[in-house]
Swiss-Prot record:
Membrane topology annotation: Peripheral membrane protein
An example Gene Ontology biological process: mRNA stabilization
Gene that this sequence comes from: ATP25
Localization terms from the record: Mitochondrion inner membrane
Pfam families: RsfS (PF02410)
The protein's role, per its UniProt record: Probable mitochondrial mRNA stabilization factor.
Keyword tRNA processing among UniProt keywords: no
Gene3D superfamilies with a match to the protein in the record: Beta Polymerase, domain 2
Annotated keywords: Membrane, Mitochondrion, Mitochondrion inner membrane, Transit peptide
Keyword Mitochondrion recorded: yes
Protein name: ATPase synthesis protein 25, mitochondrial
Family, similarity comment: Belongs to the ATP25 family.
Amino acid sequence: MLRLFRANPSSVKVWRPISTAVYSVRQNSSASKPISESRVSISEVEKDSKDEKEINEVSLPWYLRDDITSSLVEKKEILLPEIPPHAPPQVEEFLTLMACDYGMDNIMLFDMTQLPDDHEYKENNKDVDFIVVATGKSEKHIYKAANELRTHLKHKYNAMPSIEGMVSSAITPSMRRRLLRRARKGPLATDNDYGKAANSWVICHHDGIDMHMLTAPRREELNLESLWCKPEDADKFSQDSFVTSESDHIFSGIRRYHTFARAYSSATSDLESIYYKLQSQPVDAAEEELKRLQNLFEQSFSHPSIKDHGLRFQFWKTLHLARPDLVSLAQVEDALLAKYCSAESLKADMTQEKIDDITEYVKLLIDTPTRDSHKASVDLAFDRLSKIISTLYTFSNEKFSVAKNPQLVPLLWRLTYVEVKEPVIGSRDVDRFIQEQVAVATSPGPVITMASNRARDILHLIGYHTKTHPGSVPTASLRELILFTYGNAGKWDKFWQEWDNYCFEKNFTPAESVEKWTRICVYLSMRRNKAEALRFLENYWNNASSVAGSVYKSLQANGEEFNSPDERVAFKRALTNMIAMFETPEKVPFEGILSYVDQL
Protein backbone atom coordinates (compact mmCIF):
# COMPACT_ATOMS: atom_id res chain seq x y z
CA MET A 1 0.00 0.00 0.00
CA LEU A 2 1.55 3.26 -1.12
CA ARG A 3 1.14 6.36 1.03
CA LEU A 4 1.34 9.81 -0.47
CA PHE A 5 0.70 13.21 1.01
CA ARG A 6 -0.79 16.23 -0.62
CA ALA A 7 1.24 19.41 -0.28
CA ASN A 8 0.42 21.55 2.78
CA PRO A 9 -0.27 25.18 1.83
CA SER A 10 1.93 26.31 4.74
CA SER A 11 4.99 24.74 3.16
CA VAL A 12 4.62 26.64 -0.09
CA LYS A 13 6.93 29.63 -0.34
CA VAL A 14 5.05 32.91 -0.72
CA TRP A 15 6.51 35.49 -3.09
CA ARG A 16 5.98 39.02 -1.85
CA PRO A 17 5.26 41.89 -4.21
CA ILE A 18 8.15 44.21 -5.00
CA SER A 19 6.23 47.17 -3.58
CA THR A 20 5.99 45.40 -0.21
CA ALA A 21 9.72 44.71 -0.16
CA VAL A 22 10.59 48.31 -0.98
CA TYR A 23 8.26 49.54 1.73
CA SER A 24 10.02 47.31 4.27
CA VAL A 25 13.42 48.67 3.30
CA ARG A 26 12.25 52.24 3.62
CA GLN A 27 10.93 51.57 7.09
CA ASN A 28 14.44 50.71 8.31
CA SER A 29 16.53 52.97 6.09
CA SER A 30 16.99 55.56 8.85
CA ALA A 31 18.64 53.01 11.12
CA SER A 32 21.21 51.86 8.58
CA LYS A 33 24.65 53.53 8.92
CA PRO A 34 28.14 52.75 7.65
CA ILE A 35 30.01 50.22 9.77
CA SER A 36 32.88 52.64 10.37
CA GLU A 37 30.54 55.22 11.92
CA SER A 38 28.73 52.92 14.40
CA ARG A 39 29.78 50.35 16.92
CA VAL A 40 27.12 47.92 17.97
CA SER A 41 27.18 44.74 19.98
CA ILE A 42 25.91 41.34 18.83
CA SER A 43 22.89 41.62 21.06
CA GLU A 44 21.95 44.93 19.50
CA VAL A 45 22.25 43.42 16.01
CA GLU A 46 19.99 40.53 17.02
CA LYS A 47 17.54 42.96 18.55
CA ASP A 48 17.47 45.10 15.42
CA SER A 49 17.05 41.98 13.28
CA LYS A 50 14.17 40.83 15.43
CA ASP A 51 12.54 44.26 15.30
CA GLU A 52 12.92 44.37 11.53
CA LYS A 53 11.28 40.95 11.20
CA GLU A 54 8.37 42.03 13.40
CA ILE A 55 7.92 45.23 11.38
CA ASN A 56 7.96 43.27 8.13
CA GLU A 57 5.37 40.83 9.44
CA VAL A 58 3.14 43.61 10.63
CA SER A 59 3.43 45.42 7.31
CA LEU A 60 2.54 42.28 5.30
CA PRO A 61 -1.12 41.48 4.64
CA TRP A 62 -2.33 38.32 6.36
CA TYR A 63 -2.76 36.45 3.11
CA LEU A 64 0.95 36.90 2.24
CA ARG A 65 2.34 35.59 5.50
CA ASP A 66 3.95 32.17 5.74
CA ASP A 67 1.97 31.07 8.77
CA ILE A 68 -1.49 31.39 7.27
CA THR A 69 -2.24 27.69 7.92
CA SER A 70 -2.88 26.52 11.41
CA SER A 71 -0.46 23.97 12.77
CA LEU A 72 -3.45 21.94 13.94
CA VAL A 73 -4.48 21.20 10.36
CA GLU A 74 -3.10 17.79 9.45
CA LYS A 75 -1.98 16.70 6.05
CA LYS A 76 -4.46 14.44 4.32
CA GLU A 77 -3.04 10.97 3.81
CA ILE A 78 -3.69 9.37 0.44
CA LEU A 79 -3.78 5.59 0.27
CA LEU A 80 -3.01 4.09 -3.10
CA PRO A 81 -3.90 0.48 -3.85
CA GLU A 82 -1.16 -2.10 -4.09
CA ILE A 83 0.25 -2.35 -7.60
CA PRO A 84 0.98 -5.85 -8.94
CA PRO A 85 4.61 -6.41 -9.99
CA HIS A 86 3.58 -7.35 -13.52
CA ALA A 87 1.64 -4.13 -14.03
CA PRO A 88 3.01 -1.68 -16.61
CA PRO A 89 4.52 1.59 -15.30
CA GLN A 90 1.53 3.53 -16.62
CA VAL A 91 -0.62 2.05 -13.84
CA GLU A 92 1.42 3.67 -11.08
CA GLU A 93 1.63 6.87 -13.11
CA PHE A 94 -2.15 7.09 -13.52
CA LEU A 95 -2.78 6.28 -9.85
CA THR A 96 -0.42 9.06 -8.78
CA LEU A 97 -2.05 11.50 -11.17
CA MET A 98 -5.49 10.64 -9.83
CA ALA A 99 -4.46 11.04 -6.20
CA CYS A 100 -1.94 13.89 -6.15
CA ASP A 101 -2.68 15.99 -9.23
CA TYR A 102 -6.43 15.57 -9.67
CA GLY A 103 -7.52 15.19 -6.03
CA MET A 104 -9.49 11.95 -6.44
CA ASP A 105 -10.40 9.86 -3.40
CA ASN A 106 -11.22 6.23 -2.63
CA ILE A 107 -9.05 4.92 -5.47
CA MET A 108 -9.22 1.21 -6.29
CA LEU A 109 -7.29 -0.90 -8.78
CA PHE A 110 -8.66 -4.10 -10.32
CA ASP A 111 -6.37 -6.57 -12.09
CA MET A 112 -8.28 -8.32 -14.87
CA THR A 113 -5.39 -10.70 -15.53
CA GLN A 114 -5.93 -12.42 -12.17
CA LEU A 115 -9.60 -13.23 -12.71
CA PRO A 116 -10.71 -16.81 -13.47
CA ASP A 117 -10.64 -17.86 -17.11
CA ASP A 118 -14.43 -18.14 -17.27
CA HIS A 119 -14.95 -14.65 -15.84
CA GLU A 120 -16.68 -12.27 -18.23
CA TYR A 121 -14.13 -9.50 -17.66
CA LYS A 122 -11.03 -11.67 -18.02
CA GLU A 123 -8.41 -9.77 -20.05
CA ASN A 124 -8.75 -12.19 -22.97
CA ASN A 125 -12.52 -11.59 -23.05
CA LYS A 126 -12.29 -7.79 -22.88
CA ASP A 127 -9.64 -5.42 -24.19
CA VAL A 128 -8.82 -4.26 -20.66
CA ASP A 129 -6.00 -5.40 -18.36
CA PHE A 130 -6.42 -3.00 -15.43
CA ILE A 131 -9.33 -0.89 -14.20
CA VAL A 132 -8.95 2.15 -11.94
CA VAL A 133 -11.99 3.48 -10.08
CA ALA A 134 -11.89 6.83 -8.27
CA THR A 135 -14.38 9.21 -6.66
CA GLY A 136 -14.58 12.90 -7.51
CA LYS A 137 -16.04 15.69 -5.43
CA SER A 138 -18.54 16.85 -8.05
CA GLU A 139 -19.42 16.64 -11.74
CA LYS A 140 -17.38 19.78 -12.41
CA HIS A 141 -14.38 18.29 -10.58
CA ILE A 142 -14.61 15.11 -12.65
CA TYR A 143 -14.87 17.08 -15.90
CA LYS A 144 -11.76 19.08 -14.98
CA ALA A 145 -9.82 15.93 -14.06
CA ALA A 146 -10.85 14.15 -17.26
CA ASN A 147 -9.82 17.15 -19.32
CA GLU A 148 -6.41 17.28 -17.60
CA LEU A 149 -5.96 13.53 -18.10
CA ARG A 150 -6.74 13.81 -21.80
CA THR A 151 -4.22 16.64 -22.17
CA HIS A 152 -1.59 14.62 -20.30
CA LEU A 153 -2.04 11.56 -22.52
CA LYS A 154 -2.06 13.66 -25.66
CA HIS A 155 1.23 15.41 -24.92
CA LYS A 156 3.14 12.56 -23.25
CA TYR A 157 1.98 9.58 -25.33
CA ASN A 158 0.96 11.42 -28.51
CA ALA A 159 -2.41 9.67 -28.41
CA MET A 160 -5.97 10.88 -28.15
CA PRO A 161 -7.66 8.58 -25.61
CA SER A 162 -11.20 7.30 -25.81
CA ILE A 163 -13.29 9.21 -23.23
CA GLU A 164 -16.98 8.55 -22.60
CA GLY A 165 -19.38 10.54 -20.45
CA MET A 166 -17.41 13.79 -20.61
CA VAL A 167 -19.82 16.58 -21.53
CA SER A 168 -18.92 20.24 -21.73
CA SER A 169 -21.53 22.85 -20.86
CA ALA A 170 -20.14 25.28 -23.43
CA ILE A 171 -21.81 25.33 -26.84
CA THR A 172 -19.24 25.82 -29.55
CA PRO A 173 -20.05 26.72 -33.15
CA SER A 174 -19.31 23.18 -34.25
CA MET A 175 -21.67 21.86 -31.57
CA ARG A 176 -24.38 24.19 -32.78
CA ARG A 177 -23.96 22.78 -36.28
CA ARG A 178 -24.16 19.23 -34.95
CA LEU A 179 -27.31 20.05 -33.02
CA LEU A 180 -28.85 21.53 -36.14
CA ARG A 181 -27.94 18.41 -38.12
CA ARG A 182 -29.35 16.21 -35.36
CA ALA A 183 -32.58 18.18 -35.37
CA ARG A 184 -33.11 17.23 -39.00
CA LYS A 185 -32.95 13.52 -38.23
CA GLY A 186 -35.89 11.45 -37.24
CA PRO A 187 -36.00 10.06 -33.71
CA LEU A 188 -34.27 6.72 -33.30
CA ALA A 189 -36.20 3.80 -31.94
CA THR A 190 -33.23 2.62 -29.87
CA ASP A 191 -32.37 5.98 -28.29
CA ASN A 192 -32.49 5.88 -24.49
CA ASP A 193 -32.02 8.67 -21.97
CA TYR A 194 -31.74 7.60 -18.35
CA GLY A 195 -31.72 11.12 -16.92
CA LYS A 196 -28.27 10.91 -15.32
CA ALA A 197 -26.29 14.08 -14.66
CA ALA A 198 -23.54 14.87 -17.13
CA ASN A 199 -19.97 14.05 -16.00
CA SER A 200 -21.21 11.98 -13.05
CA TRP A 201 -19.42 8.99 -14.64
CA VAL A 202 -16.51 9.50 -17.00
CA ILE A 203 -14.48 6.64 -18.50
CA CYS A 204 -11.06 7.01 -20.11
CA HIS A 205 -9.46 4.09 -21.97
CA HIS A 206 -5.77 4.07 -22.85
CA ASP A 207 -3.49 1.15 -23.71
CA GLY A 208 -5.44 -1.57 -21.91
CA ILE A 209 -6.20 0.56 -18.83
CA ASP A 210 -9.69 1.85 -18.01
CA MET A 211 -10.02 4.79 -15.63
CA HIS A 212 -13.48 5.39 -14.14
CA MET A 213 -14.17 8.69 -12.35
CA LEU A 214 -17.55 8.89 -10.61
CA THR A 215 -19.33 11.04 -8.10
CA ALA A 216 -19.94 9.38 -4.74
CA PRO A 217 -23.72 8.90 -5.21
CA ARG A 218 -23.28 7.52 -8.72
CA ARG A 219 -20.53 5.15 -7.62
CA GLU A 220 -22.62 3.85 -4.75
CA GLU A 221 -25.58 3.46 -7.06
CA LEU A 222 -23.78 1.52 -9.79
CA ASN A 223 -21.52 -0.56 -7.53
CA LEU A 224 -19.15 -1.30 -10.40
CA GLU A 225 -16.66 -2.93 -8.07
CA SER A 226 -18.89 -5.99 -7.82
CA LEU A 227 -18.42 -6.61 -11.55
CA TRP A 228 -14.62 -6.63 -11.57
CA CYS A 229 -13.66 -8.05 -8.18
CA LYS A 230 -12.51 -11.60 -7.61
CA PRO A 231 -15.24 -14.10 -6.70
CA GLU A 232 -13.86 -14.44 -3.17
CA ASP A 233 -14.07 -10.64 -2.68
CA ALA A 234 -17.71 -10.31 -3.79
CA ASP A 235 -18.94 -9.95 -0.18
CA LYS A 236 -16.79 -6.86 0.32
CA PHE A 237 -18.75 -4.95 -2.31
CA SER A 238 -22.26 -6.14 -1.52
CA GLN A 239 -24.62 -3.27 -0.73
CA ASP A 240 -26.14 -3.49 2.72
CA SER A 241 -29.67 -2.27 3.24
CA PHE A 242 -30.26 0.67 5.56
CA VAL A 243 -31.45 -0.44 9.01
CA THR A 244 -33.84 1.77 10.98
CA SER A 245 -33.94 2.07 14.75
CA GLU A 246 -36.60 3.32 17.14
CA SER A 247 -35.90 6.54 19.05
CA ASP A 248 -37.70 8.73 21.58
CA HIS A 249 -36.11 11.91 20.22
CA ILE A 250 -38.55 14.76 19.62
CA PHE A 251 -37.67 14.71 15.91
CA SER A 252 -37.92 10.94 15.58
CA GLY A 253 -41.00 11.21 13.36
CA ILE A 254 -39.19 13.46 10.91
CA ARG A 255 -36.18 11.17 10.93
CA ARG A 256 -38.51 8.21 10.34
CA TYR A 257 -39.93 9.77 7.19
CA HIS A 258 -36.42 10.60 6.07
CA THR A 259 -35.41 6.99 6.70
CA PHE A 260 -38.29 5.72 4.60
CA ALA A 261 -37.26 7.97 1.72
CA ARG A 262 -33.75 6.60 1.90
CA ALA A 263 -35.06 3.03 1.94
CA TYR A 264 -37.07 3.62 -1.24
CA SER A 265 -34.10 5.31 -2.82
CA SER A 266 -31.92 2.36 -1.88
CA ALA A 267 -34.44 -0.05 -3.43
CA THR A 268 -34.45 1.98 -6.63
CA SER A 269 -30.64 1.94 -6.67
CA ASP A 270 -30.67 -1.85 -6.31
CA LEU A 271 -33.07 -2.18 -9.24
CA GLU A 272 -30.93 0.13 -11.37
CA SER A 273 -27.83 -1.85 -10.45
CA ILE A 274 -29.47 -5.12 -11.52
CA TYR A 275 -30.70 -3.49 -14.71
CA TYR A 276 -27.17 -2.29 -15.45
CA LYS A 277 -25.84 -5.80 -14.95
CA LEU A 278 -28.41 -7.09 -17.43
CA GLN A 279 -27.30 -4.54 -20.01
CA SER A 280 -23.68 -5.57 -19.45
CA GLN A 281 -24.37 -9.18 -20.36
CA PRO A 282 -22.86 -10.42 -23.65
CA VAL A 283 -25.05 -11.32 -26.59
CA ASP A 284 -24.60 -15.04 -25.98
CA ALA A 285 -25.27 -14.88 -22.24
CA ALA A 286 -26.37 -18.11 -20.62
CA GLU A 287 -30.06 -18.55 -19.97
CA GLU A 288 -29.35 -19.41 -16.32
CA GLU A 289 -27.64 -16.06 -15.74
CA LEU A 290 -30.51 -14.13 -17.33
CA LYS A 291 -33.04 -16.01 -15.21
CA ARG A 292 -30.96 -15.32 -12.10
CA LEU A 293 -30.99 -11.58 -12.82
CA GLN A 294 -34.70 -11.76 -13.58
CA ASN A 295 -35.46 -13.43 -10.24
CA LEU A 296 -33.14 -11.04 -8.41
CA PHE A 297 -34.94 -8.06 -9.92
CA GLU A 298 -38.37 -9.39 -8.94
CA GLN A 299 -37.19 -10.08 -5.38
CA SER A 300 -35.91 -6.51 -5.07
CA PHE A 301 -39.13 -5.08 -6.51
CA SER A 302 -40.80 -4.11 -3.22
CA HIS A 303 -42.73 -0.92 -2.35
CA PRO A 304 -42.39 0.16 -5.99
CA SER A 305 -42.68 3.78 -7.03
CA ILE A 306 -43.73 5.06 -10.44
CA LYS A 307 -40.04 5.21 -11.36
CA ASP A 308 -39.56 1.59 -10.25
CA HIS A 309 -42.44 0.45 -12.47
CA GLY A 310 -40.87 2.25 -15.42
CA LEU A 311 -37.54 0.56 -14.66
CA ARG A 312 -39.27 -2.81 -14.50
CA PHE A 313 -40.81 -2.24 -17.93
CA GLN A 314 -37.37 -1.37 -19.34
CA PHE A 315 -35.87 -4.47 -17.68
CA TRP A 316 -38.45 -6.81 -19.21
CA LYS A 317 -38.19 -5.02 -22.53
CA THR A 318 -34.41 -5.56 -22.61
CA LEU A 319 -34.87 -9.24 -21.78
CA HIS A 320 -37.44 -9.64 -24.54
CA LEU A 321 -35.24 -7.97 -27.15
CA ALA A 322 -32.33 -10.24 -26.20
CA ARG A 323 -34.26 -13.49 -25.62
CA PRO A 324 -37.85 -13.43 -26.90
CA ASP A 325 -38.14 -17.11 -26.01
CA LEU A 326 -37.49 -16.25 -22.37
CA VAL A 327 -39.79 -13.22 -22.09
CA SER A 328 -42.74 -12.83 -24.43
CA LEU A 329 -44.16 -9.58 -25.77
CA ALA A 330 -47.32 -10.12 -23.71
CA GLN A 331 -45.25 -10.25 -20.50
CA VAL A 332 -43.64 -6.92 -21.36
CA GLU A 333 -47.10 -5.45 -21.93
CA ASP A 334 -48.19 -6.70 -18.50
CA ALA A 335 -45.17 -5.00 -16.93
CA LEU A 336 -46.17 -1.75 -18.62
CA LEU A 337 -49.82 -1.91 -17.53
CA ALA A 338 -48.89 -2.86 -13.95
CA LYS A 339 -47.76 0.73 -13.40
CA TYR A 340 -51.32 1.95 -13.87
CA CYS A 341 -52.73 -0.69 -11.52
CA SER A 342 -50.63 0.56 -8.59
CA ALA A 343 -51.85 2.89 -5.87
CA GLU A 344 -49.11 5.38 -6.71
CA SER A 345 -50.67 6.02 -10.12
CA LEU A 346 -53.88 7.23 -8.44
CA LYS A 347 -52.01 9.97 -6.59
CA ALA A 348 -49.76 11.23 -9.39
CA ASP A 349 -50.48 13.11 -12.59
CA MET A 350 -50.02 10.44 -15.25
CA THR A 351 -50.83 12.54 -18.31
CA GLN A 352 -47.30 12.83 -19.66
CA GLU A 353 -46.40 9.42 -18.25
CA LYS A 354 -49.01 7.78 -20.48
CA ILE A 355 -47.85 9.40 -23.69
CA ASP A 356 -44.20 8.60 -22.87
CA ASP A 357 -45.04 4.97 -22.16
CA ILE A 358 -46.96 4.70 -25.42
CA THR A 359 -43.91 6.09 -27.21
CA GLU A 360 -41.68 3.49 -25.57
CA TYR A 361 -44.18 0.78 -26.44
CA VAL A 362 -44.12 1.79 -30.12
CA LYS A 363 -40.33 1.49 -30.02
CA LEU A 364 -40.78 -2.00 -28.60
CA LEU A 365 -43.15 -2.96 -31.42
CA ILE A 366 -40.58 -1.75 -33.97
CA ASP A 367 -37.59 -3.49 -32.40
CA THR A 368 -39.18 -6.77 -31.28
CA PRO A 369 -37.52 -9.86 -32.81
CA THR A 370 -40.93 -11.51 -33.17
CA ARG A 371 -41.87 -9.14 -35.98
CA ASP A 372 -41.62 -10.81 -39.40
CA SER A 373 -41.36 -9.30 -42.88
CA HIS A 374 -45.02 -9.70 -43.87
CA LYS A 375 -47.59 -6.94 -44.04
CA ALA A 376 -49.74 -8.86 -41.58
CA SER A 377 -47.20 -8.13 -38.86
CA VAL A 378 -47.80 -4.40 -39.37
CA ASP A 379 -51.54 -4.85 -38.85
CA LEU A 380 -50.89 -6.98 -35.77
CA ALA A 381 -48.58 -4.30 -34.33
CA PHE A 382 -51.19 -1.57 -34.80
CA ASP A 383 -53.85 -3.78 -33.23
CA ARG A 384 -51.67 -4.27 -30.16
CA LEU A 385 -51.01 -0.53 -29.99
CA SER A 386 -54.70 0.34 -30.20
CA LYS A 387 -55.50 -2.06 -27.34
CA ILE A 388 -52.82 -0.51 -25.12
CA ILE A 389 -54.06 3.02 -25.86
CA SER A 390 -57.64 1.95 -25.21
CA THR A 391 -56.68 0.35 -21.89
CA LEU A 392 -54.87 3.46 -20.67
CA TYR A 393 -57.56 5.96 -21.66
CA THR A 394 -60.86 4.06 -21.27
CA PHE A 395 -61.65 5.19 -17.70
CA SER A 396 -59.86 8.52 -17.95
CA ASN A 397 -61.01 12.04 -18.68
CA GLU A 398 -57.86 12.60 -20.72
CA LYS A 399 -57.68 12.31 -24.48
CA PHE A 400 -54.87 10.72 -26.41
CA SER A 401 -52.95 13.33 -28.42
CA VAL A 402 -49.84 12.89 -30.53
CA ALA A 403 -48.95 16.55 -29.91
CA LYS A 404 -47.65 15.80 -26.42
CA ASN A 405 -44.60 13.90 -27.67
CA PRO A 406 -42.92 14.95 -30.95
CA GLN A 407 -41.29 11.52 -31.28
CA LEU A 408 -44.56 9.66 -31.57
CA VAL A 409 -45.60 10.61 -35.12
CA PRO A 410 -42.28 9.55 -36.77
CA LEU A 411 -42.39 6.31 -34.79
CA LEU A 412 -45.96 5.61 -35.91
CA TRP A 413 -44.85 6.10 -39.52
CA ARG A 414 -41.88 3.81 -38.92
CA LEU A 415 -44.32 1.17 -37.70
CA THR A 416 -46.03 1.08 -41.13
CA TYR A 417 -43.26 -0.92 -42.83
CA VAL A 418 -40.87 -3.79 -42.19
CA GLU A 419 -37.38 -4.27 -43.59
CA VAL A 420 -36.85 -7.23 -45.92
CA LYS A 421 -33.34 -6.49 -47.20
CA GLU A 422 -30.34 -4.72 -45.78
CA PRO A 423 -29.17 -2.05 -45.84
CA VAL A 424 -32.11 0.36 -45.86
CA ILE A 425 -30.99 3.87 -46.78
CA GLY A 426 -32.16 6.51 -44.31
CA SER A 427 -31.36 10.00 -43.11
CA ARG A 428 -28.39 8.84 -41.06
CA ASP A 429 -26.81 7.21 -44.10
CA VAL A 430 -27.20 10.45 -46.04
CA ASP A 431 -25.62 12.36 -43.16
CA ARG A 432 -22.67 9.97 -43.06
CA PHE A 433 -22.16 10.32 -46.80
CA ILE A 434 -22.04 14.12 -46.49
CA GLN A 435 -20.07 14.42 -43.27
CA GLU A 436 -17.77 11.38 -43.41
CA GLN A 437 -17.81 10.46 -47.13
CA VAL A 438 -19.07 6.96 -46.25
CA ALA A 439 -21.27 5.45 -48.96
CA VAL A 440 -23.66 2.53 -48.47
CA ALA A 441 -24.64 0.53 -51.55
CA THR A 442 -28.05 -1.10 -51.60
CA SER A 443 -30.26 -3.04 -53.95
CA PRO A 444 -32.03 -0.88 -56.57
CA GLY A 445 -35.28 -2.72 -55.94
CA PRO A 446 -37.63 -2.56 -52.95
CA VAL A 447 -35.90 -3.20 -49.62
CA ILE A 448 -38.93 -2.76 -47.35
CA THR A 449 -42.52 -4.01 -47.30
CA MET A 450 -44.98 -1.19 -46.71
CA ALA A 451 -48.56 -1.43 -45.47
CA SER A 452 -50.13 1.22 -47.69
CA ASN A 453 -53.43 1.41 -45.80
CA ARG A 454 -51.69 1.97 -42.48
CA ALA A 455 -49.42 4.58 -44.07
CA ARG A 456 -52.49 6.35 -45.43
CA ASP A 457 -54.03 6.38 -41.93
CA ILE A 458 -50.90 7.94 -40.44
CA LEU A 459 -50.88 10.62 -43.16
CA HIS A 460 -54.51 11.41 -42.30
CA LEU A 461 -53.50 11.61 -38.64
CA ILE A 462 -50.71 14.03 -39.52
CA GLY A 463 -53.13 16.14 -41.54
CA TYR A 464 -55.66 16.20 -38.71
CA HIS A 465 -52.94 17.12 -36.23
CA THR A 466 -51.84 20.00 -38.46
CA LYS A 467 -55.40 21.35 -38.67
CA THR A 468 -56.20 21.06 -34.96
CA HIS A 469 -52.88 22.59 -33.86
CA PRO A 470 -52.33 25.82 -35.82
CA GLY A 471 -48.70 26.50 -36.57
CA SER A 472 -47.80 22.83 -36.17
CA VAL A 473 -46.41 21.47 -39.43
CA PRO A 474 -44.54 18.24 -40.16
CA THR A 475 -40.84 18.67 -39.47
CA ALA A 476 -38.21 18.40 -42.18
CA SER A 477 -36.97 15.13 -40.68
CA LEU A 478 -40.48 13.63 -40.83
CA ARG A 479 -40.97 14.72 -44.45
CA GLU A 480 -37.63 13.18 -45.36
CA LEU A 481 -38.54 9.98 -43.52
CA ILE A 482 -41.78 9.71 -45.52
CA LEU A 483 -39.93 10.48 -48.76
CA PHE A 484 -37.22 7.88 -48.23
CA THR A 485 -39.82 5.30 -47.17
CA TYR A 486 -41.53 5.56 -50.55
CA GLY A 487 -38.17 5.23 -52.30
CA ASN A 488 -37.12 2.22 -50.23
CA ALA A 489 -40.47 0.55 -50.92
CA GLY A 490 -40.05 1.07 -54.67
CA LYS A 491 -43.09 3.38 -54.84
CA TRP A 492 -41.28 5.94 -56.97
CA ASP A 493 -44.37 7.72 -58.25
CA LYS A 494 -45.37 8.55 -54.69
CA PHE A 495 -41.73 9.43 -54.00
CA TRP A 496 -41.62 12.16 -56.67
CA GLN A 497 -45.14 13.32 -55.84
CA GLU A 498 -44.13 13.79 -52.21
CA TRP A 499 -40.98 15.61 -53.33
CA ASP A 500 -42.94 17.99 -55.56
CA ASN A 501 -45.49 18.70 -52.83
CA TYR A 502 -42.77 19.33 -50.26
CA CYS A 503 -40.87 21.77 -52.46
CA PHE A 504 -44.09 23.50 -53.56
CA GLU A 505 -45.39 23.96 -50.00
CA LYS A 506 -42.13 25.23 -48.56
CA ASN A 507 -40.59 28.51 -49.62
CA PHE A 508 -36.95 27.49 -49.36
CA THR A 509 -34.11 30.00 -49.34
CA PRO A 510 -31.38 29.41 -51.97
CA ALA A 511 -29.10 27.88 -49.33
CA GLU A 512 -31.87 25.56 -48.11
CA SER A 513 -32.66 24.54 -51.69
CA VAL A 514 -29.03 23.59 -52.32
CA GLU A 515 -29.05 21.50 -49.16
CA LYS A 516 -32.25 19.66 -50.16
CA TRP A 517 -30.98 18.94 -53.68
CA THR A 518 -27.70 17.65 -52.25
CA ARG A 519 -29.49 15.23 -49.93
CA ILE A 520 -31.77 13.92 -52.69
CA CYS A 521 -28.75 13.41 -54.97
CA VAL A 522 -26.92 11.49 -52.26
CA TYR A 523 -29.96 9.28 -51.62
CA LEU A 524 -30.47 8.45 -55.30
CA SER A 525 -26.77 7.70 -55.80
CA MET A 526 -26.83 5.15 -52.97
CA ARG A 527 -30.11 3.58 -54.14
CA ARG A 528 -28.47 2.87 -57.53
CA ASN A 529 -31.76 2.74 -59.42
CA LYS A 530 -30.89 3.64 -63.01
CA ALA A 531 -34.45 4.50 -64.06
CA GLU A 532 -34.97 6.95 -61.19
CA ALA A 533 -31.54 8.50 -61.69
CA LEU A 534 -32.46 9.11 -65.32
CA ARG A 535 -35.79 10.64 -64.29
CA PHE A 536 -33.99 12.97 -61.89
CA LEU A 537 -31.43 14.14 -64.46
CA GLU A 538 -34.05 14.71 -67.15
CA ASN A 539 -36.80 16.32 -65.04
CA TYR A 540 -35.02 18.08 -62.21
CA TRP A 541 -31.56 19.16 -63.35
CA ASN A 542 -32.56 22.15 -65.50
CA ASN A 543 -36.28 21.85 -66.20
CA ALA A 544 -38.10 25.18 -66.01
CA SER A 545 -41.53 23.51 -65.84
CA SER A 546 -40.75 21.41 -62.78
CA VAL A 547 -42.96 22.14 -59.76
CA ALA A 548 -40.04 21.50 -57.41
CA GLY A 549 -37.69 23.77 -59.36
CA SER A 550 -34.33 22.65 -60.70
CA VAL A 551 -30.90 21.91 -59.34
CA TYR A 552 -29.16 24.26 -61.76
CA LYS A 553 -31.36 27.26 -60.91
CA SER A 554 -30.94 26.68 -57.17
CA LEU A 555 -27.16 26.64 -57.56
CA GLN A 556 -27.24 29.81 -59.63
CA ALA A 557 -29.49 31.56 -57.09
CA ASN A 558 -27.06 30.67 -54.31
CA GLY A 559 -24.01 31.86 -56.26
CA GLU A 560 -22.83 28.27 -56.83
CA GLU A 561 -22.03 28.13 -53.13
CA PHE A 562 -22.67 25.29 -50.69
CA ASN A 563 -23.34 25.35 -46.97
CA SER A 564 -20.07 23.56 -46.20
CA PRO A 565 -17.05 22.07 -48.00
CA ASP A 566 -18.33 18.59 -47.09
CA GLU A 567 -21.63 19.34 -48.79
CA ARG A 568 -19.83 20.46 -51.96
CA VAL A 569 -17.75 17.27 -52.08
CA ALA A 570 -20.81 15.09 -51.40
CA PHE A 571 -22.86 16.77 -54.15
CA LYS A 572 -20.14 16.37 -56.78
CA ARG A 573 -19.45 12.78 -55.79
CA ALA A 574 -23.14 11.78 -55.72
CA LEU A 575 -23.92 13.33 -59.10
CA THR A 576 -20.84 11.74 -60.66
CA ASN A 577 -21.86 8.33 -59.28
CA MET A 578 -25.36 8.72 -60.69
CA ILE A 579 -24.08 9.49 -64.20
CA ALA A 580 -21.57 6.63 -63.92
CA MET A 581 -24.48 4.16 -63.73
CA PHE A 582 -25.08 4.59 -67.45
CA GLU A 583 -23.08 3.06 -70.27
CA THR A 584 -20.93 5.29 -72.47
CA PRO A 585 -23.56 6.02 -75.21
CA GLU A 586 -26.15 6.92 -72.60
CA LYS A 587 -23.67 9.09 -70.74
CA VAL A 588 -23.10 11.46 -73.67
CA PRO A 589 -26.17 13.69 -73.00
CA PHE A 590 -24.88 14.28 -69.48
CA GLU A 591 -21.35 15.36 -70.38
CA GLY A 592 -22.41 18.98 -69.96
CA ILE A 593 -23.59 18.24 -66.42
CA LEU A 594 -20.28 16.57 -65.60
CA SER A 595 -18.32 19.55 -66.94
CA TYR A 596 -20.42 21.95 -64.88
CA VAL A 597 -20.07 19.84 -61.73
CA ASP A 598 -16.29 19.59 -62.12
CA GLN A 599 -15.85 23.36 -62.04
CA LEU A 600 -17.94 23.82 -58.86
